Every structure is written in C-alpha cells, then in structure tokens.
C-alpha cells in the first residue's frame, strides 16, 4: 500500500513539471509582446490580441498538466 501511495506522489510530482514549461512559455509570449510594441507602437492592439491568444494556449498546456497531476493523486 505504501508503494502505491509513493508512486502516486512521484507521478503527480513529475506531471506537475509541465507547469514549468507553461510558465516559461508565458514569459516568452509577453517578452515578445514588449519587444514588438517597442519596435512598432502602432501595432499595439493587434500584438496584444495575439499575445493573449498565445498566453491562453500556453496556460492551457499548464492546466492540462495540473489536471493530470490531480487525477493521479485523487482518481487513481
């Protein structure tokens, strides 16, 4: 029983590593937004729209990793 519980915790910890990738992806998206607006301030609205879309896609991958971690902890 203890081995199964340890496996759950290790698996959930490894699954939550995907959150690091989501954080890095979000940082890259907003760094590109700042870079793009500083180069061409006239495109601020369009670049902001694209960056929100990129943020949502990056955050979705992180939420999927979090969902898998919770499933490993509580559903299995």
Swiss-Prot record:
SUPFAM superfamilies: F1F0 ATP synthase subunit C. Disulfide bonds: none annotated. Belongs to the ATPase C chain family. The keyword Glycoprotein does not apply. This is ATP synthase subunit 9, mitochondrial. The record marks 59 as: Reversibly protonated during proton transport. Its main location: mitochondrion. It is a multi-pass membrane protein. One of its GO terms (biological process) is proton motive force-driven ATP synthesis. The modification N-formylmethionine is found at residue 1.
